[in-house]
């Protein structure tokens, strides 16, 4: 960042220092962090103990097989797994037929984190495929000819912004997209996920994300949305899907990220939210759980850890003197160790936890969380912590949109040159990039 009074998310590539401290999870005393159920077993405690036992086996095996334990990100194996998936999927993915733009996004974002270029012919094929997924009524469906839905719309726009070419940007019909968002807007400020569908915080985030990236925010599009999201924060401190529901990592990320885009972070009790999310990092495993009393899951390496840069920036803007200017407010080393020791499939790809299968969803969000844990701040305040070998370093990701920071700047710069559909001159303040404010 430029100065201590201007905290940004942009982390340019740098020569990242490798953390040389002993592995946190392999300390002899670390076993004391395991669950103590005081001899009162519940279904929850039994399942937690099973997971901890599997993870203890991983830690012990790693320590036994490495005279000098060194964490290694299996970049080549992950690359080949992702490369194959972009061209052809097995019939096991038939259940995700309505999530095909998501598959494009998960794979493309994973590749950009690994700093693997996307061949032009592949980029063109993705653009042409996503164009087939775009509805004549605006927005994108889960596949060609399917009804539009905000979730695949978010995924498609992110994928196209990652490609970042004129061809990719031109796929997006901004006029129809704006009409589609208006068709989903509810009187209380919330959004439907699709016409006739459910309302929850995901839809508000997806709408705010695609609207801000493509410069289609109008003065009234998000009227009442920040207030509705604030009502979703519950007594725990996190955010539920709708007002009155249990706090959940995915919904909490969506809620806070949407408010960052709308410049309304102060609508929330930020200190309460901070306490909730930092309590979700597991003491023994090092990864994050999605809710209180749930199991660790690699995907929350992003959904939960990604909240901490957003909270750091919001609290910094309020002048909080207790904030570190070198570390996020979670155990970055422990999270990296969990991902690198427990979430890598030997054949490539990443997973939820030991014993689970790899998939593109967990590959994307484990790598995204690993990137968050490696990079803090930018410019003069840049502070990297890369566990293991130097080659483990990933490209940074923007914690609001979860694509490369430079891709956010490139897309917003491109679309800001175009007028908001229906407005000859519209310079609404929320169309600026949260990365550079």
Swiss-Prot record:
Residues reported in the UniProt entry to bind Zn(2+): 297, 299, 362
Entry keywords, A to Z: Lipid metabolism, Metal-binding, Phosphoprotein, Prenyltransferase, Repeat, Transferase, Zinc
Phosphoserine, modified sites: 432
Any Gene Ontology biological process: negative regulation of cell population proliferation
Cofactor note: Binds 1 zinc ion per subunit.
Reactions listed under catalytic activity: L-cysteinyl-[protein] + (2E,6E)-farnesyl diphosphate = S-(2E,6E)-farnesyl-L-cysteinyl-[protein] + diphosphate
Protein name: Protein farnesyltransferase subunit beta
UniProt lineage: Eukaryota, Metazoa, Chordata, Craniata, Vertebrata
């Amino acid at each position: 960042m430029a100065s201590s009074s201007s905290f940004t998310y942009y982390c340019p590539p740098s020569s990242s220092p490798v953390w040389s401290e002993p592995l946190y999870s392999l300390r002899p005393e670390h076993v004391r962090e395991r669950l103590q159920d005081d001899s009162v077993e519940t279904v929850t405690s039994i399942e937690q103990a099973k997971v901890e036992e599997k993870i203890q086996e991983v830690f012990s095996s790693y320590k036994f097989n490495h005279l000098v334990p060194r964490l290694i990100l299996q970049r080549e194996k992950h690359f080949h797994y992702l490369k194959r998936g972009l061209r052809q999927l097995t019939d096991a993915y038939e259940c995700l037929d309505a999530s095909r733009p998501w598959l494009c996004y998960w794979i493309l974002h994973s590749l950009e984190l690994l700093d693997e270029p996307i061949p032009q012919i592949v980029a063109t094929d993705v653009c042409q495929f996503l164009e087939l997924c775009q509805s004549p009524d605006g927005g994108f469906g889960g596949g060609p000819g399917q009804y539009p839905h905000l979730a695949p719309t978010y995924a498609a726009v992110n994928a196209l912004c990652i490609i970042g070419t004129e061809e990719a940007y031109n796929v997006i019909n901004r006029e129809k997209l704006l009409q589609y968002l208006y068709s989903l807007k509810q009187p209380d400020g919330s959004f439907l996920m699709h016409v006739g569908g459910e309302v929850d915080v995901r839809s508000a985030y997806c709408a705010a994300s695609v609207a801000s990236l493509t410069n289609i925010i109008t003065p009234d599009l998000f009227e009442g949305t920040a207030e509705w999201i604030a009502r979703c924060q519950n007594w725990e401190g996190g955010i539920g899907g709708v007002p009155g529901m249990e706090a959940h990592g995915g919904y909490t990320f969506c809620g806070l990220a949407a408010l960052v885009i709308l410049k309304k972070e102060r609508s929330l009790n930020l200190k309460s939210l901070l306490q909730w999310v930092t309590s979700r990092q597991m003491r023994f495993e090092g990864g994050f759980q999605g809710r209180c009393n749930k199991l660790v899951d690699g995907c929350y390496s992003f959904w939960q850890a990604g909240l901490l840069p957003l909270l750091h920036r919001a609290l910094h803007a309020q002048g909080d003197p207790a904030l570190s200017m070198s570390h996020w407010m979670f155990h970055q080393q422990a999270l990296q160790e969990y991902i690198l020791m427990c979430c890598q499939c030997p054949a490539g790809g990443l997973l939820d936890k030991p014993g689970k299968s790899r998939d593109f969803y967990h590959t994307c969000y484990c790598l995204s969380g690993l990137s968050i844990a490696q990079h803090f701040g930018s410019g003069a305040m840049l502070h990297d912590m890369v566990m293991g070998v130097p080659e483990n370093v990933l490209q940074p990701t923007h914690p609001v949109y979860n694509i490369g920071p430079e891709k956010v700047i490139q897309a917003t710069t491109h679309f800001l040159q175009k007028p908001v559909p229906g407005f000859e001159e519209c310079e609404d303040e929320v169309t600026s990039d949260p990365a550079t404010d």
